[in-house]
């Protein structure tokens, strides 16, 4: 485990989908000082990007008070969306540069509300490249899918 600063929450999140759309899952690994918490869930019919957003939302929602947070994701869609594209989309009335509606607008709006509660630094890591915490988040996301499939909801 890499050395971590005290009093900062480290949130590692990932989304996964089997088929796109298809059954999907999200996973979150949270670390704060010596404490660790794992969260996961799944949805019967979703997309990979929706699960990436949901992972970040659920991780941030789980924090009971405003915090300093370092979020690590392997999703450029999530990282660039929240740090670069969101203000532009809002200025354009939730339209992309080619005038089409932004996909997943309700999730982006929910994520923005959660982000506003905290001071966040966003990091991107290459997926499936051996980053230990990202691999755990990926395993949790896949557990979410497995649980959805086990329930027989497709």
Curated annotation (Swiss-Prot):
It is an enzyme of class 3 (hydrolase). GO terms for cellular component: cytoplasm. GO terms for biological process: DNA replication, removal of RNA primer. GO terms for molecular function: magnesium ion binding; nucleic acid binding; RNA-DNA hybrid ribonuclease activity. Binds 1 Mg(2+) ion per subunit. May bind a second metal ion at a regulatory site, or after substrate binding. It catalyses: Endonucleolytic cleavage to 5'-phosphomonoester. Its main location: cytoplasm. Residues 5-146 form the RNase H type-1 domain. The keyword RNA-binding does not apply. The keyword Chaperone does not apply. Keywords: Cytoplasm, Endonuclease, Hydrolase, Magnesium, Metal-binding, Nuclease. Its cofactor is Mg(2+). It is found in: Cytoplasm. Monomer. Endonuclease that specifically degrades the RNA of RNA-DNA hybrids. Belongs to the RNase H family. This is Ribonuclease H. It comes from Coxiella burnetii (strain RSA 493 / Nine Mile phase I).
């Amino acid at each position: 485990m890499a050395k971590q600063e005290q009093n900062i929450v480290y949130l590692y999140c990932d989304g996964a989908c089997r088929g796109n759309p298809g059954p999907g899952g999200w996973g979150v690994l949270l670390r704060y000082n010596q404490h660790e918490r794992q969260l996961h869930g799944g949805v019967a019919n979703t997309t990979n990007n929706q699960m990436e957003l949901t992972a970040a939302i659920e991780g941030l929602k789980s924090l009971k008070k405003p915090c300093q947070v370092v979020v690590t994701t392997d999703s450029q869609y999530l990282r660039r969306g929240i740090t670069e594209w969101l203000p532009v989309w809002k200025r354009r009335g939730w339209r992309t540069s080619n005038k089409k509606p932004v996909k997943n607008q309700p999730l982006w709006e929910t994520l923005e509300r959660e982000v506003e509660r905290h001071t966040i630094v966003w990091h991107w890591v290459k997926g499936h490249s051996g980053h230990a915490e990202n691999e755990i988040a990926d395993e949790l996301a896949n557990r979410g899918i497995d649980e959805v499939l086990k329930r027989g909801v497709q």
